[in-house]
Every structure is written in structure tokens, then in C-alpha cells.
Amino acid sequence: MKSFVNYDQNSDFSIYNIPFGVAVFANEYIACCTRIGDMVIDLATLYDYGFFDDIEGLNENIFEAYTLNEFIELGKPVTKAVRLKIQELLAENSKLALDEKTIEECFFNIDQIRMMMPVHIPNYTDFYSSIEHATNVGKMFRDPANALLPNWKHLPVGYHGRASSIVVSGTDIIRPKGQTKPADLDSPIFGPSKQLDFELEM
């Protein structure tokens, strides 16, 4: 399948990968969006122009939301139908390909917009799903000879995660502050942490 939008064939955002997100456009206008190549597409305006009229169950103004939560709650049949419709619209010789006015109003270079958190995450649970990670943590906090808890292989071990730690890609990370005690001082001091660890969540 070819698109009328020119993009690098090595791009992560081809016509076969239609992601959903939320972006801040010009004049602080916020809408749900998708992307192909380096172009971000305003789905709310596409909806207003009737390009999704044949999709059943798609609520009016659904793409004007500040998160994708309501859209996701419509269920897989609806979100899949929208994704297939977007692929159809982005294809060569589609009705959108010939609509210069809509393209001008709905298509923006990635440098012209700012991405937001795509979903509201009120809470989440983190799991020890890697035996290497669980073993390393066990060595730090328990007997290194018995680092892995006996129940680890028999039930999922989870713990409460901090939703505030989930941020948009590219967000600056603020180094935490707390107490540290230099070896040459009698009392601890307050300041930025000396070391910072991080995890990649997938």
C-alpha cells in the first residue's frame, strides 16, 4: 500500500503503523491525532469534515478530548475501524489525497506541534517479570544466596507504581532531592541525589 504523503521508507510511522496520540496544535488547540512520516494529522478536524461518518459507534467530538481514554473505551471494533479508515484516506488516489483544503487544515509537521500524554493513567501496578531483575533486587536487599523469593516462579509478584513517573517522551527528568551523608561530615546534608537509577518499562 502506498501513501500520497511522502515519507522516509525507514520511518517508524508508515502507512502500516497508524498510531493514536494527543497533540497541542497552533493557538494551544488540543486534539487527538495520528502520524505518518513527519506529518501529524488532526483527527478532530477530519471528523468535522465527515471523513469518519460511515463508522458506527464513533461519538461526536470524540477526537476533541484531551486524552484517548474515551476513544479506547469504545472498544476494539471501533478503534480498528478508525485505523483502517485512516489507512484508506492516506492511500494514493484517495478522496483526501485530492482535497488540498483539508490537507492544509489537518496536516502539520511534527516540529509544529507538541505531544501530550495520550491517556490519563490514574494508577498502575508494576510486576517483577524478569528473573534477572528480580534476582538482582533480591541480592541487594536480601541474602544473595537466596535472592529469588520461593513464590516468584509460581505467582506474579507486583507492587504499586507511581503514575506520576509516566511522562511524555522528551520530558526533562528532575533529579530527586534528599539527604546524603558525605564521609567527611558528621551530619547529613540536603540536596540533589548523587546517583540516579532508571528502568525501561515495556
Predicted feature locations:
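Active-site microenvironments in enzyme catalytic cores
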Residues: 1-28, 35, 41-202
